[in-house]
Amino acid sequence: GLRRGDSDFDYVSAGDINRNGLIDAYDISVVATQLEDGIENPGTDRVAGTIFLSTPKQTYNAGETVEITVKGDSVKAVNALSFALPYDQQDYDFVGIEPANLGTMENLTYDRLHTSGQKALYPTFVNLGDKQVLEGSEDLFTIKLKTKRKVTFNLKAVDGILVDKNLNMQKF
């Protein structure tokens, strides 16, 4: 979740392998695919599909919990995923993530306050070593936010990527 411009980005900027100004699932995958004896035969399946977010309603009163369902849509060969969910800290507090259908992926989600003052949640899930990839269309996890005041939910995922075992990327 570190972005170019954060006070500590320069310390880890060499880890921004894809040079997009953000430490994301791709950068983490470069190392993660080599852990736990690595991936001997990554196969030829190329990453595909998309991810979308939904909530049961649009308007929430202060103190309510917003449950954001994160669903994979026709995903194929997904070995890692990440996106940013910028939000106004005057409106929400991050409560947690409930994994649903993520297999053995490690949850590396981080709720970050950037040096610029922008708050963003970075849901990030990565397989370490050679593990089962995500396939199909199903709910992957739920993000829970607590409202601080009455809000109309309009948060959007940005900088979303899916990564396969060969480090091919699919943006969403």
Question: Which positions does each model-derived feature cover?
Answer:
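Glycine-rich, flexible loop segments associated with nucleotide phosphate handling
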Residues: 10-15, 48
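Acidic, low-complexity intrinsically disordered segments
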Residues: 29, 33-172
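Alpha-helical segments with a strong preference for the paired helices of cellulosomal dockerin domains
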Residues: 1-8, 20-42
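Alpha-helical context
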Residues: 7, 11, 59-61
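Residue-level detector of alpha-helix boundaries and kinks
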Residues: 16-17, 128
